[in-house]
Curated annotation (Swiss-Prot):
UniProt KW keywords: ATP-binding, Cytoplasm, Ligase, Magnesium, Metal-binding, Nitrogen fixation, Nucleotide-binding, Stress response
NCBIfam families: gln_syn_GlnII
The species this protein was found in: Frankia alni
A Pfam family that the UniProt record links to this protein: Gln-synt_N
Any one annotated GO CC term: cytoplasm
Catalysed transformations (reactions): L-glutamate + NH4(+) + ATP = L-glutamine + ADP + phosphate + H(+)
Transmembrane segments: none
Protein name per UniProt: Glutamine synthetase
Quaternary structure (record): Homooctamer and homotetramer.
Name of the gene this protein is made from: glnII
UniProt similarity note: Belongs to the glutamine synthetase family.
E.C. designation(s): 6.3.1.2
Limits of the GS beta-grasp domain: 3-82
Positions that bind L-glutamate: 272
Length: 352
């Protein structure tokens, strides 16, 4: 007998990578091994030297096919085993450097359903009722997409992902799922696999999933990926939380440059955001760059929430940056990742 292994990877499309997958039939008793693909068709290699390598890094049961079938998330490498479009390696390296601090993450992944070029459930002409009743709402026409959300949630559970919850978001057609609490790069692995499952399940309904930061211009909420972060030190005391919050304010441009496409469109100071170029932090403040949950402020220990990452962010880059900035500050080191150069695209000057 044999089983099906769905090899899943992140391609090299810019500025937002796409997810790709293909099926391999493997004999029972054998594990998924490295495989290959045509990188010239995924923006990861030239046509004259197009072979790329898929190296398995994370496997789960396949909740769609069932049985003994598997999902296999892969790193992409060239045939010399270097990873030019693979950001997972950066997250792994900095996580190992500060492993003694136990940096951990929970990510709130927002997204928007689309059908026929409009947010799912919106009228063919015009707009739905203003924002207000949709966030965590219930009832009929207000909550389009719930069937997909329910199937996705169960699929994540069946796959063994660390899904913590789901909810409808502020704009009609917008939802969220949460993954955590996990270290890096495992949190990135599970976010990417959760995204793939969402795309795959939405296919069955003729619905598309968008992770665009500001899918609809105007007086509508954007879509983010609020990233909750803790270390052994922050879980033990308030001073470490303050150190992390202050450290994040010293590298504003470095962070927002790598927090996803369209950061200036979403982080405007409206719709529960802080301006992208003005850093702030505070307790219970959803208009701050970094929020301290009320329970954390009361206990004087716990975690912080960076509200700046977009829904389309690369979780490997975001977690690598947060570990580098926060843990280096706690250790009295200098951060080493993603120091801007003349070739680094960045928004205009940021301030604290």
């Amino acid at each position: 007998m044999s089983y099906q292994a769905e090899y899943i990877w992140i391609d090299g499309t810019e500025p937002e990578p796409l997810m790709r997958s293909k099926t391999r039939i493997i004999k029972d008793g054998k594990e998924p091994e490295i495989w290959g693909f045509d990188g010239s068709s995924t923006n990861q290699a030239p046509g004259s030297n197009s072979d790329c390598v898929l190296r398995p890094v994370f496997e789960t049961p396949d909740p769609i096919r069932g049985g003994d079938n598997r999902l296999v998330l892969c790193e992409v490498q060239l045939t010399d085993f270097t990873p030019p479009t693979n950001t997972r390696a950066a997250a792994l390296g900095v996580a190992e450097r500060y492993a003694d601090m136990s940096p951990m993450f929970g990510i709130e992944q927002e997204y928007t359903f689309f059908k026929d070029g409009r947010p799912y459930g919106w009228p063919e002409v015009g707009y739905p009722a203003p924002q207000g009743p949709y966030y965590c709402g219930v009832g009929g026409s207000k909550m389009p997409g719930r069937q997909i959300v329910e199937r996705h949630t169960q699929a994540c559970l069946d796959a063994g992902l660390a899904i913590e919850g789901t909810n409808a978001e502020v704009m009609m057609g917008q939802w969220e799922f949460q993954i955590g609490v996990l270290p890096a790069p495992a949190i990135g692995d599970q976010i990417w696999l959760g995204r793939w499952l969402l795309h795959r399940i939405a296919e069955d309904y003729g619905v598309e999933v968008s992770f665009a930061a500001k899918p609809i211009p105007g007086d509508w909420n954007g879509a983010g990926a609020h990233t909750n972060f803790s270390t052994k030190q922050t879980m033990e005391g308030w001073d470490a939380i303050v150190t992390c919050c202050e450290a994040l304010g010293t590298r504003v441009t470095e962070h927002v440059t790598h927090y996803g496409k369209g950061i200036e469109d979403r982080l405007t100071g409206k719709h529960e955001t802080a301006p992208w170029n003005k850093y702030s932090w505070g307790a219970s403040d959803r208009g701050a760059s970094v929020r301290i949950p009320w329970a954390v402020e009361k206990a004087k220990k716990g975690w912080l929430e960076d509200r700046r990452p977009n829904a389309n962010m690369d979780p490997y880059l975001v977690t690598a940056l947060m570990i580098d900035t926060c843990c280096s500050a706690l250790a009295g080191d200098k951060p080493t990742l993603f120091v801007p150069s003349q070739t680094t695209p960045a928004p205009a000057e940021a301030s604290v």
